[in-house]
Design a protein with these regions (language model features):
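An acidic- and aromatic-residue-enriched active-site/binding cleft used to recognize and process polar
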Residues: 18-21, 85-90, 114-115, 128
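A structural signal for well-ordered alpha-helical segments within the folded catalytic domains
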Residues: 65-69, 148-156, 298
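GT-A fold catalytic core of metal-dependent nucleotide-sugar glycosyltransferases
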Residues: 63-109
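An acidic/histidine-cluster motif and surrounding catalytic segment
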Residues: 46-58, 147
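N-terminal anchoring/stem segment of glycosyltransferases
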Residues: 1-51, 76, 127-133, 259-312
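Catalytic core and acceptor-binding pocket of nucleotide-sugar-dependent glycosyltransferases
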Residues: 132-290
Length: 320
């Protein structure tokens, strides 16, 4: 938040959360905040019927879907205003073209992870009427599919006419050889908002910075290209320009990557010196195959949680 405020000082930045402690910390930094209504209370029925395991990452699958409700609640308070939602683990380079989203002539815009799935790492909503319509669509989709995720929901919207949708470009047209799925070409390779670069939905950031080590008990998996994603990052050449902005290199030209999905939650990105060192290291080693690093802190927390869980299960069995 401090990085965003310093990098984009003229933008109307809000931190949205249902955690009072996080809201208080942001307020202390002089950042505008909005305390969201508790989604577990507002969407009790959805939470109860959702087929995804609620114990995974403290209700991860429910919370990512419930963000639709939270955004709508925020936009009903801030009516007739465009909103560009940036996930907390998405890093924006100073080159990020926020001005391109002003008066965008569509109702909703986001990048696609694959042909079938969208991703809300960057999500543009035109106004409060569209956010309300999106919420209504989400509830209808959920009634038809209890395995619904926010990514499937956005994918369905991308392939329907329920909302006027514009896919954010994630790969230049002339780099289509890096596609895993040729069917995704029109959703991934486009210049829909006339920019000099591309937006990272998840593929480049996850490849370069690693998969969240909490998924593997502290093991950070780097340079893994996901076959389920539209883009095969192994077929791209990554570099850094003079401003230390990640670029896609092709035939002597550099294509800006405006943001990185920081799936690994690496906080070094947000300090200039540590960011420069981190990105130089990661870019230099890219294209040489998958590697793994052990994140000690995450590993120890994982072990501690496992011990606590086993103790609780043992106590529960004794009571029975």
């Amino acid at each position: 938040l401090e990085y965003l405020k310093a990098t984009f000082p003229d933008e109307d930045l809000y931190f949205i959360s249902d955690c009072r402690k996080s809201i208080a910390k942001a307020n202390q930094k002089g950042i505008k905040t909005w305390l969201a209504p508790n989604p577990e209370m507002q969407w009790q029925g959805v939470r109860a019927e959702l087929n995804h395991p609620l114990e995974f990452r403290d209700g991860f699958w429910f919370k990512t879907l419930a963000r639709i409700f939270v955004l709508n609640s925020f936009m009903q308070v801030h009516q007739n205003q465009e909103v560009l939602q940036i996930e907390a683990d998405v890093f924006l380079f100073p080159s990020f073209p926020i001005s391109k989203f002003i008066d965008l002539n569509v109702e909703i815009s986001f990048p696609m992870e694959s042909y079938d799935r969208g991703i809300a790492s960057i999500l543009y909503l035109k106004n409060h009427k569209i956010s309300e319509k999106l919420t209504d669509i989400a509830l209808i989709e959920f009634e038809n599919n209890k395995n619904l995720t926010d990514m499937l929901l956005l994918g369905n919207i991308a392939h329907s006419r329920l909302l006027n949708f514009l896919p954010l470009p994630t790969l230049p047209n002339d780099m289509q050889n890096a596609l895993n799925d040729a069917n995704a070409f029109g959703l991934v390779c486009n210049n829909s908002i006339n920019t000099s670069g591309v937006f990272d939905g998840i593929s480049v950031g996850q490849y370069l910075l690693g998969i969240d080590p909490r998924n593997s008990r502290g093991l950070l998996k780097l340079y893994r290209s996901q076959s389920s994603h539209a883009i095969n990052v192994d077929n791209l050449t990554l570099g850094l320009n003079i401003d230390e902005n990640v670029v896609l290199k092709d035939s002597g030209r550099d294509i800006l990557v405006f943001n990185l999905h920081n799936h690994a939650k690496d906080l070094r990105l947000y300090k200039e010196k540590s960011r420069k060192k981190l990105l130089q290291k990661r870019v230099k080693s890219s294209g040489q195959g998958e590697i793994q690093e052990l994140v000690i802190k995450v590993f120890l927390v994982s072990v501690l949680k496992s011990i606590i869980r086993k103790v609780r299960n043992g106590l529960h069995q004794q009571k029975i």
